Amino acid sequence: MEKYLVGGAVRDALLKLPVQEKDWVVVGSSPQEMLNIGYEQVGKDFPVFLHPESHEEYALARTERKSGQGYTGFICHTAPSITIEEDLYRRDLTINAMAYDSHGNLIDPYHGQRDIKLRLLRHVSHTFHEDPLRVLRVARFAARFAHMNFAIAPETLILMKQMIHELLSLSPERIWTETKKALITDNPQVYFTVLRHCGALKILFPELDALFDIPTPTQYCTKINTGYYTMTTLSKAAYLTDDISVRFSVLCRDLGKGIPLNKINKNTKHHDHRKLGITLIHNLCNRFKIPHEIRNFSKITSEYHDYLYNVKILKPEMLMTLFHVFDCWRRPNRIDQIILVSQSDPIRWKNYNNYSLNQENLLRTAFTVTKKISTVDIIKDGFTGSNISRELYARRLHALNSWKNKQI
């Protein structure tokens, strides 16, 4: 029996990155032998075991053969005779197809170390095209390692373009899992850009893909492509925060500008894009079973984000509406989230630093004014039942009016 450290742990060690988790491959063993020495079997499709002390995963070396469509259409074969080189051959990218043996020697039959030096994401073998999930994985790795100047090998990108017809065989959960992982990288915009380059964006996220045909007239700049503008905005959001709700809402904020393409003039100012976007976000989130917390914040942001840039001129009633729809009184962190959404817009805020800071301060101050109104005081004053909420609204509105009058 030989044990090898494999995959991401080896790659990250060579890149001098923190190793998050360790995966192992066992050569020369059998399921029964693993059980006999105290390992716990957890894999259903192929033999994977948990170490009795470290609880790290140990998989028996295996080969895979394509048997049907999708990423699950494989027949796995395990046997004591399967070598580490055969096991590594089934992996997606050369940088993920390396191992360390028990003596610390690097096993690198497919030149992963070379591609790390070249900063290339290159497929291991022709069998790459058999698993459509690899299109998403490569796009995610491109996003994850963009700050290290990794690029996709041209021959790998060609294969990805040939694989997109099988993408719809992937489960919605699997697509969202890869997308979520990409969204929390330092450069999530790279993930969607890669998907567009290989044709996958049009299949999986047609709402996003449509934006690349639409210009965005703004008062701050000349007409620019809405798709690229969205990618720039997502990049700015990723720089500002790790909050996936903020990042996703920024990604989806302008979806309404992309439809209906056959009815909207490409030179339109998209007056109705906010409401159009709500339906698109709802459908997209349902399609991929995206968590309610993320989808709800994104839908609200789509409808109300334009108001966030003009806090100074908003009437108290509109400020109250904003605080209500974003549920700020019960969830004060929402104020930080919506400010981050507004700060992510690179065009609106460019060269307007003092103005933008003032808008942010005004929004925070306005919310603080309303938050000081206590329900306890209202109850002490004798209000009961539904009259409590009505009086709470009235007092908050009055406080905002008084505050606004002092700003003039």
Curated annotation (Swiss-Prot):
GO biological process: RNA repair; tRNA 3'-terminal CCA addition
Keywords, alphabetical: ATP-binding, Magnesium, Metal-binding, Nucleotide-binding, Nucleotidyltransferase, RNA repair, RNA-binding, Transferase, tRNA processing
Domain HD: 226-329
Residues bound to Mg(2+): 21, 23
Gene3D superfamilies: Beta Polymerase, domain 2, cca-adding enzyme, domain 2
Family: Belongs to the tRNA nucleotidyltransferase/poly(A) polymerase family. Bacterial CCA-adding enzyme type 2 subfamily.
Keyword Glycosyltransferase on entry: no
Cofactor(s) of this protein: Mg(2+)
Record: residues binding CTP: 8, 11, 91, 137, 140
Binding-site residues for ATP, renumbered to this chain: 8, 11, 91, 137, 140
Reactions it catalyzes: a tRNA precursor + 2 CTP + ATP = a tRNA with a 3' CCA end + 3 diphosphate; a tRNA with a 3' CCA end + 2 CTP + ATP = a tRNA with a 3' CCACCA end + 3 diphosphate
Parts of the chain that traverse the membrane: none
SUPFAM superfamilies attached to this UniProt entry: Nucleotidyltransferase, Poly A polymerase C-terminal region-like
Gene coding for it: cca
First-tier enzyme category under EC: transferase
MF-aspect GO terms: ATP binding; CCA tRNA nucleotidyltransferase activity; magnesium ion binding; tRNA binding
UniProt protein name: CCA-adding enzyme
Function: Catalyzes the addition and repair of the essential 3'-terminal CCA sequence in tRNAs without using a nucleic acid template. Adds these three nucleotides in the order of C, C, and A to the tRNA nucleotide-73, using CTP and ATP as substrates and producing inorganic pyrophosphate. tRNA 3'-terminal CCA addition is required both for tRNA processing and repair. Also involved in tRNA surveillance by mediating tandem CCA addition to generate a CCACCA at the 3' terminus of unstable tRNAs. While stable tRNAs receive only 3'-terminal CCA, unstable tRNAs are marked with CCACCA and rapidly degraded.
Enzyme Commission code(s) on record: 2.7.7.72
Further information: A single active site specifically recognizes both ATP and CTP and is responsible for their addition.
